[in-house]
């Protein structure tokens, strides 16, 4: 049976376009798999751009707006992109936020392992709720280099869920493209999990947790999800 690298029908993603899912699966089979197995001449950055281009296929056929056009597959530091993303609904917030009473323009720094601190703040009483600020564009290549270092270890036989969880967090915080970031990353992660004889996992709230937790907590939650997930959607 053909593997679906996108177990995405969950609380936050119920209306995924099937073409989008198909594009993701093809991008893994034709681009990422050859890269991961060292059968490609693409660099790490070229691989990301190529996979992104194949997924969007000149369109953003995702779940928020199936006809929303997006820019070419360029990193956000190569184009003029806003540096914040809203979390769409307050009820989707992770558990940790229940203990926070944010006020307008509160600024909190979260340490992400050994990379520059990631800053976010909340805006109360708005429809979009918490607003997350991405690292400045000047840090994008720095994060990509860290991602590549981790990926090289995975490609060279380090079958480590710790490294894989760290890769997810680096990628989520980097947010290299304007759109279609987490789908791309999780398709890679699910491909690797399948190679390691684990069941591919759903997105869940993992991206939110990457934004709001230090690395050790993110990896703990990722491991729990891998061990618990049975593929039942």
Q: What positions do the PLM features span?
A:
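FIC/Doc superfamily catalytic core
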Residues: 1-233
């Amino acid at each position: 049976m053909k593997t679906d690298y996108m177990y995405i029908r969950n609380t936050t993603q119920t209306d995924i376009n099937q073409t989008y899912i198909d594009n993701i699966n093809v991008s893994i089979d034709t681009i990422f798999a050859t890269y991961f197995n060292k059968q490609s001449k693409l660099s790490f950055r070229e691989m990301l751009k190529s996979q992104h281009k194949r997924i969007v296929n000149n369109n953003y056929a995702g779940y928020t707006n199936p006809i929303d056009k997006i820019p070419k597959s360029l990193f956000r530091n190569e184009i003029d992109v806003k540096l914040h993303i809203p979390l769409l609904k307050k009820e989707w917030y992770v558990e940790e936020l229940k203990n926070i009473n944010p006020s307008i323009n509160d600024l909190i720094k979260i340490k992400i392992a050994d990379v520059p601190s990631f800053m976010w703040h909340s805006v109360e009483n708005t429809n979009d709720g918490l607003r997350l600020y991405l690292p400045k564009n000047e840090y994008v290549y720095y994060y990509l280099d860290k991602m590549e270092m981790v990926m090289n270890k995975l490609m060279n036989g380090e079958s480590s869920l710790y490294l894989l969880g760290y890769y997810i967090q680096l990628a989520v915080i980097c947010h290299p493209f304007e759109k279609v970031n987490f789908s791309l990353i999780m398709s890679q992660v699910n491909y690797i999990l399948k190679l390691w004889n684990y069941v591919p996992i759903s997105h869940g709230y993992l991206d939110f947790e990457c934004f709001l937790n230090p690395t050790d907590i993110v990896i703990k939650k990722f491991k729990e999800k891998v061990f618990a997930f049975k593929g039942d959607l």
